[in-house]
From Swiss-Prot:
UniProtKB keywords: Ribonucleoprotein, Ribosomal protein, RNA-binding, rRNA-binding
Pfam families: KOW (PF00467), ribosomal_L24 (PF17136)
TM region(s), chain numbering: none
GO molecular function, one term: structural constituent of ribosome
Ribosomal protein is among the record's keywords: yes
Name of the protein this chain belongs to: Large ribosomal subunit protein uL24
SMART domains named among the record's database cross-references: KOW
Length: 103
């Protein structure tokens, strides 16, 4: 998968097109990610210890990974990702600026 938890991304298609956010969780086996503030759904929750009131809560639902594009750390624009070997480690880099994404 070309994105990881903590990456800043932009949604490139769907009802939330153009929104930016940070990846909160990634599910590589399902090819889906949860992005902060994107794809908000209303969920009916039973009363529980954490939520004694119950009722309807809004939370982020997973979206397909092909709908998000990482943001270039230098320019802040969406960019494609490439891979290269640096000091014997495989790292991701932004195709637009050449900036390395992995610390």
């Amino acid at each position: 998968m070309h994105v990881k938890k903590g990456d800043k991304v932009q949604v490139i298609s769907g009802k939330d097109k153009g929104k930016q956010g940070v990846i909160l969780a990634a599910f590589p086996k399902k090819n889906r990610v949860i992005v902060e503030g994107v794809n908000i759904v209303k969920k009916h929750a039973k009363p529980s210890q954490a939520n004694p009131q119950g009722g309807i809560i809004e939370k982020e639902a997973p979206i397909h990974v092909s709908k998000v594009m990482p943001l270039d750390p230098k320019t802040g624009e969406p960019t494609r990702i490439g891979y290269k070997i640096v000091d014997g480690k495989k790292v991701r880099y932004a195709k637009k600026s050449g900036e390395i994404l992995d610390k």
